[in-house]
Amino acid sequence: AAGAGLLASAPAFGKAGGGRNRVGLVGTGIRGTKYWGKYLLENYAYVVEYAGLCDINPGRLDFAAGVIGTDCPRYTDYDRMLNEADLDTLIVTTVDSTHHEFIVKGLQHGLTVITEKPMTTDEVRCQAIIDAEKTSSGRLLVGLNYRYGDIFSRLKEILLAEEVGRLTSVDFHWYLNTYHGASYFRRWHGLRDKGGTLLLHKAAHHFDLLNWLIGSEPVEVHAYGGLEKYGSNNKFRGPRCMECPHSGSCDFFWDMKK
């Protein structure tokens, strides 16, 4: 789950002098509502409590509160939540290209901010976040949870023990099947201006894994790619699955009501 790695050490969420950590969540999509919201209370309610939920959609806020299991205040105004909810920690699970808007303000309020990866979608927004952290008492954590999978943790142990000898080069491939891969193109992740393409949104995991596994970072990065399978290159094309006239023939049709 998204929060597993960051929350594995529950005392990190404890407050000096006791009491539960007051958490605010902005962005109540599936990721925020279930993997961060519901998971957090199910496993760490003894050190964590929700003090505020924020989204521009009031109906979604009500739904999220029910799934999470909280009766905390709900806000459609982010600044109001920051000013009224007395937060210790802020969790950001909004559209990737908007992360910086919420992270920067959270840091300026002196909060511990946990954001879904990627931190944001371009270098200008990244620099704004870095500057905000440097000039505030807040701190930022980015949720790169792949590190905490059993297979990757074991691989790290093997490398640290030098069981495979000295590394001289790495050849890394990640194959994304059409079951998982298609899901990105049913939502905003398929839009370049929202998610930065899968070279950022998805591959951020893989870049982090490599940096962590081999203990170094690249000096130069080159990337290339294209849309070969989905979108306008697909055999069928509709504005959205639920209203698509090709739903009976398309391999990628998904009924969100089920």
Segments the model singles out, each with a brief description of its role:
Residues G52, D88-T89, S169:
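Short, Asp-centered acidic motifs that coordinate Mg2+ and/or phosphate
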Residues G19-N21, G138, G165-T168:
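Nucleotide donor/acceptor-binding cores
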Residues C72-D77:
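Conserved SAM-binding strand-loop segment of SAM-dependent methyltransferases
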Residues T93-T94, W174:
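Glycine-rich, N-terminal phosphate-binding loop of Rossmann-like dinucleotide-binding domains
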Residues T89, V95-D96, H100-R147, E162:
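Beta-strand-loop-alpha-helix segment that lines the small-molecule cofactor/substrate pocket
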Residues R31-G32, Y146-K258:
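Predominantly a Rossmann-like dinucleotide-binding segment in NAD(P)-dependent oxidoreductases
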Residues A2-G69:
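N-terminal Rossmann-like dinucleotide-binding module
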